[in-house]
């Protein structure tokens, strides 16, 4: 579990960032939103690899934001919060998915951070808080 989780949630993100950075910097309003999780900032027993990968992703995002401070690129992190997804259903099989927002419900938070009007940089946001959910 460790290797696959770190590979997907951290290593692949690093390679994607390095590959896309020139295009994002060249764009008049390049935006990158890294998807984190609440487990990145709290103790989550039995969630070690996932929590560590998301905490690492947030650190990588903050470092990348510092490296691109003098460009038009804006980088932020977002934690969607509990959302009715297949991954969530697998992790919490007893949870009622109807009690959670749907992905479409939280999408506007992502769009806000991807907007050319967004000037935030190197910050972490909670999607549900942004939307009052």
For the regions a language model picked out, list residue spans one by one:
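Catalytic loop of short-chain dehydrogenase/reductase
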Residues: 1, 25, 31-56, 61-70, ...
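Active-site Tyr-X3-Lys motif and surrounding loop/helix of classical short-chain dehydrogenase/reductase
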Residues: 1-7
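A structural motif corresponding to the C-terminal end of an alpha-helix
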Residues: 19-23
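C-terminal helical subdomain
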Residues: 70-73, 77-78, 85, 94-133
